[in-house]
Amino acid sequence: FQDDNCAVSMIFGIIKALIDSGYQPRYTIAVCALAAEEWGVCDSKFDWSTGAWNQVFRVHPEWQGRVIADLNFELPAHAHNTQDAIRSTYESADFLKHFCENITVPKEAYPDGLTVLAPIETWSDDFSIAISGIPSTVNDFSAGPFMETHYHSQYDNEEFYQEAVYRFHHELYTRLLVTLDQLTLPPLDFSRHFLAMKSSVADCLAAQSNAPAEVLEEIPALLESISKVCESADLLYEKIQEINNHTVSADFPMVSGLSSKLLHIFRKMQDYFVRLDWQDAVFFPHSAASLLPSD
């Protein structure tokens, strides 16, 4: 019921609302329901994500470098915690936090409001979409007892339907979709990813007290380089915001080229800096060194 009939019906509800309102989208809005295990493969722990991976890498590779956002929905008619969350890639977190500041969350749905989490996780299709170079989000569903007691079982039924939660998610993601549709450039703040990387380097250093001296000597220079990249990324994001807020003029050919370049950078960030540990948690490649046994 929750996984994932409610998500599919929510897609229909959002699109019907846009059509009935007469809204004319600026971008093409593609509606996809591609996460069913029937699309999966045998003897694979990633069967649930095979549908999304095949869609974006094999069936529609032309989406890569063109689509500015992916909104994924999972179990959206049940409150998995007292606080709702939009989970996204690092690069979209700042934009989403500012978006959420103007959202009124009904207390009967989520008493503790709404927050933004990053990075995305592997247990839903937005991960496959993101590593193809499309900035992705999902309504966070990983917390709470439902995932341990009812998920993927016959107990996932209409008894756990929460209308206030479902209505709020309809309204929240319709508003987010329209907000994204009105942007000129994809709202990507690359500094967030590099800041997380800087923190990760420091954590790895602390975990490797017996690292070779030549490695330890290079760490300060590495951290300084990351800081400089963050400064450049901050300036880039300021320019993106200026264009999206229409505080500076930009002709369409230039904007189209900028959008493609931003999405190209995003794809490279995924290619170079996103890896998984043995528990399928997202981490940085250099973090693997801290998982190796010491001599």
For the regions a protein language model found, what residue spans apply to each?
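Short, structured coil/loop segments at alpha-helix boundaries
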Residues: S49, H60, D84-K97, T104, ...
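Active-site-adjacent substrate-binding region
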Residues: V67-D70, L75-L195, S199, A206, ...
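Sec/Tat-exported extracytoplasmic proteins
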Residues: I15-G22, A33, V59, I103-K107, ...
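A sequence-level detector of short, solvent-exposed, charge-rich linear segments
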Residues: I29-E37, S44, E74, I86, ...
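Mature extracytoplasmic or organellar-lumen-exposed domains after removal of signal/transit peptides
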Residues: F190-S191, M197-D295
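Acidic/histidine-rich catalytic neighborhood of metal-dependent amide-processing enzymes
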Residues: F1-E91
